[in-house]
Amino acid sequence: MRLTFLGTGTSCGVPTIGCRCYTCISTDPHDKRLRCSALVETAETRLLIDCGPDFRQQIMNQPFRRIDGILITHAHYDHMGGMDDIRPYCQFGEINVYADPLACQGMLQMLPYCFAEHRYPGVPAIRLHEIRPHEPFRIGDIHIMPFQVMHHDLPILGYRLTSDDADLTYITDMKTIDPAELDYLSGTRMLVVNALRHKPHHSHQTVNEAVDFAHLVGAPQTWLIHSSHDIGRHAEVNAQLPSDIQLAYDGQVIEL
């Protein structure tokens, strides 16, 4: 299994428009963060996790091949605002999109023309699949277990993906998690989880909270995503973090 971080930034991206802070003026490519999204690939299956407004830019450097499914974590624009840009991939067939009921409703409201009885030629051909926590499913050779985390008071989905010996857990926008959900993460080999900044935030984990959560899960390697400009510069933050818990960066490829 191969994991590509297409975007590792928060809803405003980094640099933030109009900002001249220490992070935003950095010339290090690792400090340029598009909105969160990831590509997960095996020899036979290709999945996208979230499809934000930077999708077109993110996918241009990737081979043009079928996308077998899109997993949506929640119904916020920075995680599904790029869905209209999947239309070139519809030449391979309908795009299967998997989301919880609230995100499915948001998709219908955001892209009503994709679900009309008589669709305009060329609009994305999307097949929505309503999924729920703890109800596993399979796409190709990847087994997927959705579980629930809390984005402040909004229940959203995390995903555990397994294929052969590869075992990846992906979480974004989490603030808290019910202890009962931890059973669904037990034994995972790689954790991807959000770390917004150092100061407390009402709906996202801080860096310290993410580190504590990583220790609780106990995965051999953890990558931190959904980071804002307030987190500081990539290299300096990583130098202060344990070697097994590091900030991810846009374009990073991990072989599992």
Predicted segment positions?
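Binuclear metal-dependent hydrolase catalytic cores
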Residues: 1-171, 180, 237-249, 253-255
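Cap/insert and terminal regions of metallo-dependent hydrolase folds
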Residues: 175-255
